[in-house]
Every structure is written in C-alpha cells, then in structure tokens.
C-alpha cells in the first residue's frame, strides 16, 4: 500500500510517496523505459536523482527552496519541476519573478551535483581524475525581451566555469565571463533535443554537442561541480511581464555523471 503525504513549500504543494521505482539505463544515460504517465508520478521516476540536490525559484528573498535526498525521490512542484505527460522527460521552469540565490540575480529550477546518495556537496578538481557530465535536454521556452537561458554547466568555487547557453536561436558554450566563447549553432529551434557533454581532466574541459567536440577550455579550479536544469538569465528588471507566465524552461530526458 502506498503512503501519501502532502508537502507545502513556499507556496508550492507537492505530493510525496514512500514508493520508489528502480531506474533503468537507456543508451548509457539513466532515464525512463516504457513507463506510462501514471508510473512517473515524480521526476525521480524518470531520472536517477540519487546524487543531486534541487534548487527551486521559490522561497524567501535570496533563500530559494532546496530539496535534498531522500525527499527529492518523491517530490514534484508543478510547474517548476515535474515529469512531462508522456513520462519521457522532466520539466524544469524558472520564471523571471522567481526567487534567486544571494550570489545571483537570476532564478533557477536546477540540479546541483552531490555525492554519497545526496548527503554531501560534490567538489572536484579539473587537474585530478576525469569528470564527465552527459545530459540529453531540450530548451522549450525562453523569457521575453532577454531570451537567454542556461541548460547545463560546470560551476567552480566562485562562479560558473563553462555552460551551455541559449540566446534566442544561438546556442553558445561559454568560458568564464566570455558568454560567446564558442557558437555551437545559430539556428537552434525550441524543443529540439540534443546531447550536451562536459569532460574535465588534465586542467582542460572538453565540451561536446551531439557527440562532436566543439571546444576545449583551460581550467585549474579544484572545487567544481555539475549543474543542470533551467537557469533563466533574465529577471523583472529586463523582461516583461514580471510574472510566472514569463519563464525559461528546459526538458531533460537523461542525465549521467561519472568520475574516474
């Protein structure tokens, strides 16, 4: 028998269940396999979120809601974080009027890499070992006026190291503050799924798009971690209307991290 409870967080109501589903692997990336919509009640039924933490665009000023394990395994928060209707992906949505962290002026519905089944925050060096993130995702909505959105990134101790960033129809891979470091494509269409991949090793980060290496950047940071989701690069000062109907959105159908 399932035990159901209702969780209310910063104006969001989400159903939580003690039941959990085993997650199969498809094409090397943990994702769903033939489930119906009724079987993916939570995003964790679609993606393996064992070693992740979620930050939502809700909560108190400069103190957004964080969801950690084990709660994340049975958590959803429509429309910011939910399994899509066909159980094929997880929707991440961050509105321009969303709550931001103290270190950013932009809202996010985003996963942050963790370790030890979600107990501790991940932190690794680009000069020791090999660290890989593979994400299958699609940008599905952009904010008005400033249509900029980040879908995956490596973050360092103080700031982002490199990200996949969409500006209108132009998809870039960044290098620190150089937001236009490398143009991947200038005709990206919303809803188009692609594979983003970062491989960090030997003080370098290789960035791949659909299996092809696009660029390599140098980095010797020793406190890195992966992030993925919707990190909207707009707010109420530069995007109108200032409400929840103006947002950035990303759908993720597969995500995998490896360290060696």
Show where each model-derived region lies.
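Secretory targeting and sorting signals
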Residues: 1-28
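Short strand-turn-strand beta-turns centered on an Asx-Gly dipeptide
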Residues: 208-212
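Short tryptophan-centered beta-strand motifs in secreted/extracellular beta-sheet-rich domains
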Residues: 133-135, 191-207
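Short, aromatic/His-centered strand-loop micro-motif at the edge of beta-sheets
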Residues: 172-195
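Ligand-recognition surfaces built from glycine- and aromatic
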Residues: 38-59, 128-132, 144, 219-260
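Short hydrophobic/aromatic-rich beta-strand segments that constitute the beta-sheet cores
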Residues: 92, 173-175, 207
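N-terminal module-boundary/linker segments of secreted carbohydrate-active enzymes
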Residues: 28-78
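Secretory/extracellular carbohydrate-interaction modules
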Residues: 71-170
């Amino acid at each position: 028998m399932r035990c159901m409870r209702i969780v209310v967080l910063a104006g969001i109501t989400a159903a939580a269940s003690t039941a959990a589903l085993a997650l199969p692997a498809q094409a090397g990336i943990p994702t769903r396999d033939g489930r119906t919509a009724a079987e993916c009640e939570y995003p964790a039924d679609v993606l393996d979120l064992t070693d992740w933490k979620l930050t939502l665009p809700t909560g108190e000023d400069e103190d957004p809601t964080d969801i950690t394990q084990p709660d994340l395994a049975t958590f959803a928060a429509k429309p910011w974080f939910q399994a899509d209707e066909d159980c094929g992906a997880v929707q991440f949505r961050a509105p321009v009027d969303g709550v931001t962290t103290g270190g950013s002026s932009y809202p996010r519905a985003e996963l942050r890499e963790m370790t030890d089944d979600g107990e501790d925050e991940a932190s690794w060096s680009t000069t020791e070992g090999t660290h890989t993130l593979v994400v299958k995702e699609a940008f599905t909505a952009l904010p008005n006026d400033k249509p900029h959105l980040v879908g995956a990134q490596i973050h360092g101790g103080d700031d982002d190291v490199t990200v996949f960033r969409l500006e209108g129809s132009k998809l870039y891979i960044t290098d620190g503050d150089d937001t236009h470091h490398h143009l991947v494509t200038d005709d990206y269409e919303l809803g188009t799924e692609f594979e983003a991949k970062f491989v960090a090793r030997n003080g370098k980060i290789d960035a791949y798009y659909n299996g092809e290496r696009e660029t390599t950047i140098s980095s010797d940071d020793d406190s890195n971690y992966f992030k993925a989701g919707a990190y909207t690069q707009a707010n109420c000062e530069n995007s109108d209307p200032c409400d929840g109907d103006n947002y950035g959105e990303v759908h993720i159908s597969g995500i995998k991290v490896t360290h060696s």
